[in-house]
């Protein structure tokens, strides 16, 4: 029971560090929540025009998921990895420090999956890349990768990891609900095109 609590709290707290907000403030750009979509993720940071800052946010958001999984694996054992992974993405998406208004968790999910079972993470990245090449829509590509992740996890890592991936997929779809509405309406912007509203991040 104590291990479960430790894995959950540790994963959540690491995941809840809002790197996009921290980096934009350190760079003198103000509050990222007042820019673009208001999201704290890398895509919204990119809207500031600072590509390096957006890349740093992407890597740190992915890294915190990987670190949460790695630490729990070493300290508490592999059986607690799915718990820590889910909690890390939960922390990113719903950080207590920001009134539970965070990002969409794509980068943190990928970092979590890469650390928990790297073939699953690579398969999801590959799915995103292929989908993006075909459809040219970032959010749709992320949703396809999320939807495929439980199957990848079941094949490469087993039922526990498939359950974690399914939970992450459900959470990811929920955080992308505005994107899904725009996709249905045919209003979601394409990669490289101009956008009027939020997409990823």
Swiss-Prot record:
GO terms for biological process: phospholipid biosynthetic process. Belongs to the PlsY family. PANTHER family: GLYCEROL-3-PHOSPHATE ACYLTRANSFERASE-RELATED (PTHR30309:SF0), INNER MEMBRANE PROTEIN YGIH (PTHR30309). Its EC number is 2.3.1.275. Keywords: Cell inner membrane, Cell membrane, Lipid biosynthesis, Lipid metabolism, Membrane, Phospholipid biosynthesis, Phospholipid metabolism, Transferase, Transmembrane, Transmembrane helix. Catalyzes the transfer of an acyl group from acyl-phosphate (acyl-PO(4)) to glycerol-3-phosphate (G3P) to form lysophosphatidic acid (LPA). This enzyme utilizes acyl-phosphate as fatty acyl donor, but not acyl-CoA or acyl-ACP. It catalyses: an acyl phosphate + sn-glycerol 3-phosphate = a 1-acyl-sn-glycero-3-phosphate + phosphate. InterPro entries: G3P_acylTferase_PlsY (IPR003811). The keyword Transferase applies. This is Glycerol-3-phosphate acyltransferase.
